[in-house]
Amino acid sequence: MPEPAKSAPAPKKGSKKAVTKTQKKGDKKRRKTRKESYAIYVYKVLKQVHPDTGISSKAMGIMNSFVNDIFERIAGEASRLAHYNKRSTITSREIQTAVRLLLPGELAKHAVSEGTKAVTKYTSSK
């Protein structure tokens, strides 16, 4: 039996027709996916504390993991506290209590004072 005539070649695996239709003349086919990171903030703090010191990409990766881990722990604890108190909103009070519960002694005191300072600065700039 004769094969049916093909009008156009089959699209390659993973390609999408809609992408080629909406494409403009100078655009590339795929954009680089954005990877969120705390790297710029870690670098800014490093330069405030030690202006003449650099950081390797491996160390930056570790710092990024550390910040993500602490963020998740504080957010989880604050969420639990809000749930216990039958609240649907996480406020600075829940965050502060979560920090006190998660961080040990002197570190918690410093974190709370820095957090309070940051919130005060933010509310005064509004």
Curated annotation (Swiss-Prot):
InterPro entries per UniProt: Histone-fold, Histone_H2A/H2B/H3, Histone_H2B, HISTONE_H2B_site
PTM summary: Monoubiquitination of Lys-121 by the BRE1 gives a specific tag for epigenetic transcriptional activation and is also prerequisite for histone H3 'Lys-4' and 'Lys-79' methylation.
Ranges for region Disordered: 1-34
UniProt keyword annotation of Phosphoprotein present: yes
Compositionally biased residues, Basic residues: 13-34
Principal location class: nucleus
Gene3D superfamilies: Histone, subunit A
Modified residues (Phosphoserine): S15
Keyword Nucleus belongs to the record: yes
Molecular function (Gene Ontology), one example: structural constituent of chromatin
Residue stretches of biased makeup (Low complexity): 1-12
Glycosylated residues, chain numbering: S113
A cellular component term, taken from the record's GO annotations: nucleus
Crosslink feature (Glycyl lysine isopeptide (Lys-Gly) (interchain with G-Cter in ubiquitin)) location: K121
Keywords attached to this entry: Acetylation, Chromosome, DNA-binding, Glycoprotein, Isopeptide bond, Nucleosome core, Nucleus, Phosphoprotein, Ubl conjugation
Subcellular location: Nucleus; Chromosome
Biological role: Core component of nucleosome. Nucleosomes wrap and compact DNA into chromatin, limiting DNA accessibility to the cellular machineries which require DNA as a template. Histones thereby play a central role in transcription regulation, DNA repair, DNA replication and chromosomal stability. DNA accessibility is regulated via a complex set of post-translational modifications of histones, also called histone code, and nucleosome remodeling.
Record text on subunit structure and interactions: The nucleosome is a histone octamer containing two molecules each of H2A, H2B, H3 and H4 assembled in one H3-H4 heterotetramer and two H2A-H2B heterodimers. The octamer wraps approximately 147 bp of DNA.
Name by which UniProt lists this protein: Histone H2B 3
